[in-house]
């Protein structure tokens, strides 16, 4: 069936529609609204986004905070040039970290960030990932110290389709105004559309709750299995406080700010009797595993053959998704992380 064929999720996007910078002020970004019941499409801007939110819905937001996850170092402490890139993914046990390192590397190699701070390669894992530990003068660093090191020397992890180096504006703009709990290596991009003013109006006028899904590097990975049902999606750390769990369990209608919030809601609501607040979220939503609990979605326009495009198709159907994306292309909407948005009602 074509809805499970990977090639069905391909489309051509003119390069000039890939957003390399955010629209400022945020309210000026374009917004496509699709109402499923009437099949009506409205073109507006984020200045009016809250006017379209159903009044009695629960709005769910992901308050993860992006780490400055890209580090540059050298293999020798005395070398001034920093040409080896370390992309931090997540912490593992005993303060070790899962990373990607560009270039040839072997177990035991050290990568220096200054005269004292360095990382040592502990293990070469499958799929190109590297297990490393961080040190200060041979003393292992704990997680808090590693995060300080990343904040001091790291760069914002802009997506691979943004073909430029990160700039000072990205520290502010590639982070939602409600980002709180550090741990993501990619922004939950629908959240980037909210200015402080829009957020305050949302919190004042709508029922809402927060959860934390630390977006992983796997969010950019394309699906590669010919049958999308065979794809193994990445795992991400999810934290839902007890108060938020109670609100989610009671709510009938849910509007998710972004695919990360939606995946979190779907994962949590399918658990029988969750007793903890921390989870490993690995839910892959597509037409064979459709959305059951979330009712509405605010999202950006996603990459061809991506799991996020399949999630949107699970909500409105493959043909309607392709039709709307073609309209967005014709109307010169800006795509991907810094791009325009779409509200599915």
UniProtKB/Swiss-Prot annotation:
<keyword id="KW-0808">Transferase</keyword>
<keyword id="KW-0949">S-adenosyl-L-methionine</keyword>
<dbReference type="InterPro" id="IPR036100">
    <property type="entry name" value="QueA_sf"/>
</dbReference>
<protein>
    <recommendedName>
        <fullName>S-adenosylmethionine:tRNA ribosyltransferase-isomerase</fullName>
        <ecNumber>2.4.99.17</ecNumber>
    </recommendedName>
</protein>
<dbReference type="GO" id="GO:0008616">
    <property type="term" value="P:queuosine biosynthetic process"/>
</dbReference>
<dbReference type="InterPro" id="IPR003699">
    <property type="entry name" value="QueA"/>
</dbReference>
<comment type="subunit">
    <text>Monomer.</text>
</comment>
<comment type="pathway">
    <text>tRNA modification; tRNA-queuosine biosynthesis.</text>
</comment>
<dbReference type="InterPro" id="IPR042118">
    <property type="entry name" value="QueA_dom1"/>
</dbReference>
<dbReference type="GO" id="GO:0005737">
    <property type="term" value="C:cytoplasm"/>
</dbReference>
<dbReference type="Pfam" id="PF02547">
    <property type="entry name" value="Queuosine_synth"/>
</dbReference>
<keyword id="KW-0671">Queuosine biosynthesis</keyword>
<dbReference type="InterPro" id="IPR042119">
    <property type="entry name" value="QueA_dom2"/>
</dbReference>
<comment type="function">
    <text>Transfers and isomerizes the ribose moiety from AdoMet to the 7-aminomethyl group of 7-deazaguanine (preQ1-tRNA) to give epoxyqueuosine (oQ-tRNA).</text>
</comment>
<dbReference type="GO" id="GO:0002099">
    <property type="term" value="P:tRNA wobble guanine modification"/>
</dbReference>
<keyword id="KW-0963">Cytoplasm</keyword>
<dbReference type="GO" id="GO:0051075">
    <property type="term" value="F:S-adenosylmethionine:tRNA ribosyltransferase-isomerase activity"/>
</dbReference>
<comment type="similarity">
    <text>Belongs to the QueA family.</text>
</comment>
């Amino acid at each position: 069936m074509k809805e499970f064929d990977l090639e069905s999720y391909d489309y051509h996007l003119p390069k000039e529609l890939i957003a390399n910078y955010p629209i400022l002020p945020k309210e000026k970004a374009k917004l496509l609204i699709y109402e499923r019941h009437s099949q009506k499409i409205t073109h507006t801007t984020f200045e009016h986004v809250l006017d379209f939110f159903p009044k009695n819905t629960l709005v769910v937001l992901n308050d993860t905070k992006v780490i400055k996850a890209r580090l540059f170092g050298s293999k020798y402490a005395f070398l001034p040039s920093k040409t080896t890139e370390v992309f931090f993914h997540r912490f593992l046990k005993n303060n070790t970290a899962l990373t990607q390192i560009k270039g040839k590397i072997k177990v035991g190699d050290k990568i220096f960030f200054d005269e004292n701070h360095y990382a040592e390669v502990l293990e070469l894992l499958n799929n190109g990932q590297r297990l490393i530990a961080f040190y200060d003068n041979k003393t292992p660093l704990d997680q808090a110290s590693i995060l300080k090191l990343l904040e001091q020397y790291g760069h914002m992890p802009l997506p691979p389709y943004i073909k430029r180096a990160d700039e000072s504006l990205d520290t502010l703009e590639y982070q939602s105004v409600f980002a709180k709990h550090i741990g993501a290596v990619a922004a939950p991009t629908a959240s980037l559309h909210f200015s402080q003013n829009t957020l305050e109006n949302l919190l004042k006028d709508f029922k809402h709750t927060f959860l934390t899904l630390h977006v992983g590097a796997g969010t950019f990975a394309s699906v590669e299995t010919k049958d999308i049902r065979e794809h193994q999606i990445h795992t991400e750390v999810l934290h839902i406080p007890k108060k938020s769990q109670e609100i989610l369990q009671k709510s009938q209608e849910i509007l998710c700010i972004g695919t990360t919030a939606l995946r979190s809601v779907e994962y949590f609501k399918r658990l029988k009797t969750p007793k903890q607040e921390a989870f490993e979220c690995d839910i892959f939503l597509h037409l064979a595993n459709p959305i059951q609990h979330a009712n509405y979605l605010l999202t950006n326009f996603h990459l061809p053959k991506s799991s996020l495009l399949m999630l949107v198709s699970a909500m409105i159907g493959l043909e309607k998704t392709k039709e709307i994306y073609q309209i967005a292309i014709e109307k010169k909407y800006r795509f991907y992380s810094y791009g325009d948005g779409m509200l599915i009602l």
